[in-house]
Amino acid sequence: KEYRRQRQMCIRDRTYYMPSYTAPVEDMMFLFEKLRNNQKYNELEKYKEVTSDLVKDILQEAAKINQNLILPLAKVGDENPAVLENGVVRTPPGYKEAYKKYIEDGWTSLSCDPKYGGQGMPKTVSAFFDEMLSSASLSFKLYSELSIGAYNCINHHATDDIKNKYLPKIVEGKWSGTM
């Protein structure tokens, strides 16, 4: 609550308090180990190759991109919000390049089905990434949120023809969900 109040004052007064964020990778790994044992991930065929070392590597890379690339965008987005000009939405400076890196590095596909180009990680792993992304820059995270919703809706309710047409494009970040 206090952070939010300070941030609103800084925005209003045109000063800026630069937030810091250190992803809690060790805490996340502790939770993953507990869930892995309780949920028996290692007994599920689709998660046989999901080891603690692999998850730790993923989370460490996720921490780097969120701390080094996404976190600085929080200030940029606050000072230069998205605008609608002549029917075209202009995102804050740096968002387009960051989103391109975000999709190139495969962050859109963490828990998506490998059948459609996803990595097939447990939802727990993508939840950890989402927590990091939300903490680094909630406004940036919201750019991908509609795509996650569209993916889940199509994956759970559409015919195979629709899934085959739309899901690979959503997973690779070429298409996104809209409202």
Where are these regions (language model features)?
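Single conserved hydrophobic/aromatic residue that forms the stacking wall/gate
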Residues: 1-13
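Amphipathic, small/basic residue-rich leader segments at the start of a protein or domain
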Residues: 12-142, 161, 165
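Well-ordered alpha-helical scaffold segments within catalytic/enzyme domains
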Residues: 152-156
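Internal maturation/activation junctions in enzymes
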Residues: 146-147, 158, 162-179
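Short, conserved phosphate-binding/catalytic loop or strand-edge motifs used
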Residues: 126-127, 145-151
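Structural beta-strand/beta-sheet cores of well-ordered domains, especially the beta-sheet scaffolds
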Residues: 28, 108, 150, 175-177
